[in-house]
């Protein structure tokens, strides 16, 4: 086994040894000279200081602070202090006032007589002319008594509705404001005016004129979110909860009262055991959603900020992640057939009399008569049925028809009289022919207007023009 060496203890300093061994006399030979300053170096400095004065420079084994007085600048004169005394104010002369003196001091001095001065000398002589003065010796006295002060009187009225009886209220008069009466003088004469024509500022142009005082050159567009740069990680989310409840993918908290259309901020990232979806690990902030179009699809996007690490200074570092989910593809535009909302007007008045039937151009109609009898029994006619075969492109359809019968014309009422005399005579009931319309005639022609109708209108029902025949109802 390897023996462990004892840890080496630090030796005491010379100052610590000097405190304990000086009294006992057991100090090493190099401790006492070092502490007391009697080494060879200290002695050389002491001997050299006897011939060279180095005082005040701090050269030696001292602390180097320049001695007690410190360092002084070289070749400088000490500054002198100038004593500036403040002059004393002159004393105020106090004049004593006796009990008999008035206590009111007039601001204006008493008026005095103004001397007119010396008289004008008179010169007399033979030569020249004589000057005679008309001046008087009466002195002029000026009355400088101060005029009386002007007194300005103003009145102000304050109306308080709380202390004013409603029946005493008066309508305020014109020109009265806060108790001061204002008097205005109407202007006299007529004043002319100048008619200034109005100018039109908006004039028709080419459409390229600027609409502001400082037009912005070019087209300014709002920059969209930079979601597909190299610094943003792209993550596709397939969970439908990302559209309605994105918070449920990052935490198990209750999102009932949390708005999902705004930025979601977490105080701190959740641990991996608390995140339902691993793609949303270390998410600190999830920005508001945005709808964009990408390669023919509608895309729902959110940008998230992760907090992967934190420095000692407290700054967080993390990547930006773009979470997206494609909603639906954008299909091509469908062509919608436009239909008129107003029905077209009729071409003519006779179009409203026709009914729409099958196209006679595409059908072959053949009539087969099984027989015809005009037997009358007690005033009633026996009608034999006819059949019609309609051949169309969809198949043969048999339609039953009723052939017309000949109705004999008789004068008088519709009562059949017996051929032989029979008594008593019992009249028969009238012939019942109200079920069908019978047309009896040898030939007929179409209405002349039908020859001018176009082909597409021939499918309508047209009226008949009888050449020779009768109609019985």
Swiss-Prot record:
Disulfide bonds join 21-27. It is found in: Virion; Host nucleus; Host early endosome; Host Golgi apparatus. GO terms for molecular function: DNA binding; structural molecule activity. A motif (Nuclear localization signal) lies at residues 1-12, 452-462. Highly phosphorylated. InterPro entries: Late_L2 (IPR000784). GO terms for cellular component: host cell; host cell endosome; host cell Golgi apparatus; host cell nucleus; viral capsid. It holds the Pfam family Late_protein_L2. Its main location: virion. GO terms for biological process: microtubule-dependent intracellular transport of viral material towards nucleus; symbiont entry into host cell; viral penetration into host nucleus. Interacts with major capsid protein L1. Interacts with E2; this interaction inhibits E2 transcriptional activity but not the DNA replication function E2. Interacts with host GADD45GIP1. Interacts with host HSPA8; this interaction is required for L2 nuclear translocation. Interacts with host importins KPNB2 and KPNB3. Forms a complex with importin alpha2-beta1 heterodimers via interaction with the importin alpha2 adapter. Interacts with host DYNLT1; this interaction is essential for virus intracellular transport during entry. Minor protein of the capsid that localizes along the inner surface of the virion, within the central cavities beneath the L1 pentamers. Plays a role in capsid stabilization through interaction with the major capsid protein L1. Once the virion enters the host cell, L2 escorts the genomic DNA into the nucleus by promoting escape from the endosomal compartments and traffic through the host Golgi network. Belongs to the papillomaviridae L2 protein family. This is Minor capsid protein L2. The lineage of its organism: Viruses, Monodnaviria, Shotokuvirae, Cossaviricota, Papovaviricetes.
